Amino acid sequence: MNADTAPFWRRKTLDQLDSKEWESLCDGCGLCCLQKLEDEEDNSVYYTSIACKLLDLQTCQCSDYPNRFKHVPDCIQLTPGKADQFKWLPPTCGYRLVSEGQDLPAWHHLVSGDRTQVHEQRISRSGRMLSENDVDEDDWEDHLIFRAG
């Protein structure tokens, strides 16, 4: 495949993407919306199976994406300018992969044309999460699922 016909994520840097291209890199896994805990001794970040109160536990989509910062002031906004901080994202994340110069996986909707693959391949935590509204914060350590990085 020559450079002119290569997909945009192979031809452009993150800073060159337009807003539609940027948003399309999101595979819809919802993992970035899981609550994370940081180990105070070594600064490791651990993902829990506890989801943000706005995350739909089946579709892995934010229930109020346009207004999320009003409801969750510390919601993380990914931008190309923060690419050097993407190491905390899951290794399957499109933003992280492209920022590291890697290709998107075969199941990613931009490659497969099928947005359900992220769930069918069990990349997302669809149906395997709990809402933060249902778990006391003191119990989050009981729900660790993987270490970031």
UniProtKB/Swiss-Prot annotation:
Disulfide bonds: none annotated. Signal peptide: none annotated. PANTHER family: UPF0260 PROTEIN YCGN (PTHR37421:SF1). Belongs to the UPF0260 family. This is UPF0260 protein PSEEN4031. It comes from Pseudomonas entomophila (strain L48).
